[in-house]
Amino acid sequence: MAQTEIELDGLLAFPLTPFTEDLEINLDGFAENVESHIAAGAGALFVACGTGEFSSLSVDEVAALLAKAREVANGRVPVWVGAGGGAAGARAGVAAAQAGNADGVLLLPPYLVTGPQDGLVDYVRYAVGDTSVPVIVYHRSTGVFTAPTAAKLLDIPSVVGIKDGYGDVETMTRIVTTIRALGTQRSADFLFFNGLPTAEVSAKAYAAAGVARYSSAVHCFAPEIAHRFHRALAENDDATMDALLAGFYLPLVALRDETPGFAVSLVKAAARLRGDKVGTVRPPLIEPTPEQIDRLGKVVENGFAVLKGL
């Protein structure tokens, strides 16, 4: 697939993975979740990724989620899927994504160990193998790339972009500038994404660095707010962005930062507050306390009040 065929415009959604009371995947609930994202206007779906609790899922569960998402989407939006972890698992995941007709793969970092820069490129190359499914490399955690190393990813034909979850704008600016400066069609087409938790908080800074695309966890429970912010960013509407940041996103981040893992747990809790059947999180993530859920409800309520006043 030529890189110019990659369609990842608009707001990128990362569906939650619903679980039953005994923490088995709930495919019926997942189908409803996928449909709600599409109906709300998601530009693409990334299933079984960070927000979808990839680290807690088995290979068979990821395959089942991909198949269900493709069935529900029925070609209306692109469906990407997560892969990663240990080298063998990452390779198997990419191969399974291609076999399952995924539109692409978000390749998560190596599991547990941190290798040198050349080792990171080798990890991506090994994971990709002889597949041709498009791959976006997640730059975070045990997989943080320098700009020269990131440029080497362009030697792997199916790698079409980098998603930043590391959070260093200077590093990402170096990566974007280094790749664009190569002056080839390949480097001009290469895609960059802001993949930080609650990416709206850093969206203006990243857009200024040439990274306007981002994923929105808020789309899981308040797509109306997520789309209004996304439109404001595209229109350079600082007043709207600042109002939503002050009245909703920053209070949400303050609550999120109270407990490790709340970048996922709070999203699931907020989705439940809005009536979605997503269940709880798998360990080692934990659920918010009743007091935190009460505060979460007030944050979401205030967010919609701000939205109404715009």
Question: Where does each model-flagged region fall?
Answer:
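A general structural signal for well-ordered alpha-helical segments in protein cores
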Residues: V62, L66, A90, M172, ...
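C-terminal extensions of enzymes
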Residues: T259-L310
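Conserved, mostly hydrophobic/aromatic
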Residues: L23, H37, A69, A127, ...
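Active-site beta->alpha loop and helix N-cap motifs at the rims of alpha/beta catalytic domains
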Residues: A2-F145, I286, L310
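Catalytic alpha/beta core domains of metabolic enzymes, predominantly
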Residues: S141-L252, R256-P260
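Alpha-helical structural signal in soluble globular domains
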Residues: A40, A64, K68-A73, A96-G100, ...
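A non-catalytic, amphipathic alpha-helix used as a structural packing/dimerization or gating element
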Residues: G29-S36, D60, A64, K68, ...
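Generic alpha-helical structural context detector
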Residues: A13, R231, K268-R272
